[in-house]
């Protein structure tokens, strides 16, 4: 068996995103970014997960906002055409419990959300007050 042929058959394009360091400028609404506060539709409802943290405490916690990717900004790099060509992809994860997703009880500890509407209609929204500061990620622009 020629492993190179096998790997070539399953090889897919990857899009590598890098973030700006020490960028204090405010980013326009609808721009791709890591952390900070997400730009979401007005009817967006924050995601929560009930799980046990490392200290053994079980409670409902808001998921941390990890990133938003403006699909129009990255479509030129999507050589395989797998991503939507417009809209916004959001990534959320519950950082207090840090579930891997292997256990069925982990369901809901991570979310990918897709908004297929007009990104100019998005609203910058604060993370929930119940999200502890240590789980709020600093904003970094994508370069």
Regions found by a protein language model. Give the residues of each.
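An N-terminus-focused feature that recognizes amino-terminal "leader" regions
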Residues: 1-88
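Conserved small/polar residues in nucleotide/adenosyl-binding loops
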Residues: 142-143
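Structured catalytic cores of large enzymes
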Residues: 130-131
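Aromatic- and glycine-enriched beta-alpha-beta binding-site module
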Residues: 63-127
């Amino acid at each position: 068996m020629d492993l190179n042929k096998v790997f070539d058959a399953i090889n897919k394009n990857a899009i590598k995103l890098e973030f700006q360091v020490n960028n204090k400028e405010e980013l326009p609404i609808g721009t791709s970014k890591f952390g900070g506060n997400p730009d979401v539709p007005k009817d967006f409802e924050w995601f929560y997960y009930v799980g046990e943290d490392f200290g053994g405490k079980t409670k409902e916690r808001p998921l941390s906002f990890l990133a938003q990717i403006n699909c129009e900004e990255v479509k030129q790099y999507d050589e395989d055409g797998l991503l939507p060509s417009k809209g916004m992809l959001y990534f959320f994860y519950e950082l207090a419990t840090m579930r891997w997703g292997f256990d069925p009880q982990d369901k809901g500890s991570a979310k990918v959300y897709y908004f297929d509407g007009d990104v100019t209609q998005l609203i910058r929204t604060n993370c929930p007050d119940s999200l502890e500061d240590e789980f709020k990620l600093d904003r970094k622009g994508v370069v």
